[in-house]
Curated annotation (Swiss-Prot):
Its main location: endoplasmic reticulum. It comes from Drosophila virilis (Fruit fly). It is found in: Endoplasmic reticulum membrane. Belongs to the EMP24/GP25L family. The lineage of its organism: Eukaryota, Metazoa, Ecdysozoa, Arthropoda, Hexapoda. Residues 21-183 are lumenal. GO terms for biological process: dorsal/ventral pattern formation. This is Transmembrane emp24 domain-containing protein eca. Residues 134-164 form a coiled coil. The keyword Signal applies. A motif (Prevents secretion from ER) lies at residues 213-216. Keywords: Coiled coil, Developmental protein, Endoplasmic reticulum, Membrane, Signal, Transmembrane, Transmembrane helix. InterPro entries: Emp24-like, GOLD_dom.
Length: 216
């Protein structure tokens, strides 16, 4: 029983992601990230843009004139979010189809600063990691125990979504494998038919050649 509890705790602790990173781009460069998201799952993106200062050889908070255009596409390549934000912001969206969601970011400027380099700090939170439980507790006036139960229920719900998504991926992979195997089979049969026809044609051609030479 204790081992089962430990395993469940590990699953809950490692459950879907909150990733923090930073990257460098020029003002006209586009950067995209792929995040696998189950359906009906909230995703929150926090970012901050810093502008390179050659005088101090470091990065400073960017000019108010620089913003970030954020575009999000779902697994069907449908745009579900496209908007220009300021140099520091927070956005959220909810997935309606499971699969890979592409999050693209690029500066809204047109090289006003001669293509200056930008540093973008990015933090993507998915699932129950995207919920601000302190705010939830304050709004709904939950006790510490009620809040903990709420967190556990949300985690269980997220685990269910993850399991459903894994089943969806397995089904899609199986369908792709079956389709590939079917194509390979038909291609092999087509090659066999072509080889048989070529062999038959060559035999008839040789027979006609030998008959013309009166060798048979």
């Amino acid at each position: 029983m204790r081992n089962q509890f430990i395993c469940l705790a590990l699953v809950l602790c490692t459950l879907h992601s909150a990733c923090g990173l930073y990257f460098h781009i020029s003002e006209t460069e586009r950067k995209c990230f792929i995040e696998e998201v189950p359906d009906e799952t909230t995703v929150i993106v926090n970012y901050k843009v810093e502008l390179y200062d050659p005088r101090s050889n470091g990065f400073m908070p960017s000019s108010p004139g620089i913003g970030m255009h954020v575009e999000v596409r779902d697994s069907d390549d449908k745009v579900i979010l496209s908007r220009v934000y300021s140099s520091q912001g927070r956005m959220s969206f909810t997935s309606h189809t499971p699969g890979e969601h592409v999050i693209c970011m690029y500066s809204n400027s047109t090289a006003w600063f001669n293509g200056a380099q930008l540093r973008v700090h990015l933090d993507i939170q998915v699932g129950e990691h995207a919920i601000d439980y302190a705010n939830v507790a304050q709004k709904e006036k939950l006790t510490e125990l009620q809040l903990r139960i709420r967190q556990l229920l949300d985690q269980v719900e997220q685990i269910t979504k993850e399991q459903n998504y894994q089943r969806y991926r397995e089904e899609r992979f199986r369908h792709t494998s079956e389709s590939t195997n079917s194509r390979v089979l038909w291609w092999s049969l087509a090659q066999t038919v072509v080889l048989v026809c070529m062999g038959f044609w060559q035999m008839r051609h040789l027979k006609s050649f030998f008959e013309a030479k009166k060798l048979v």
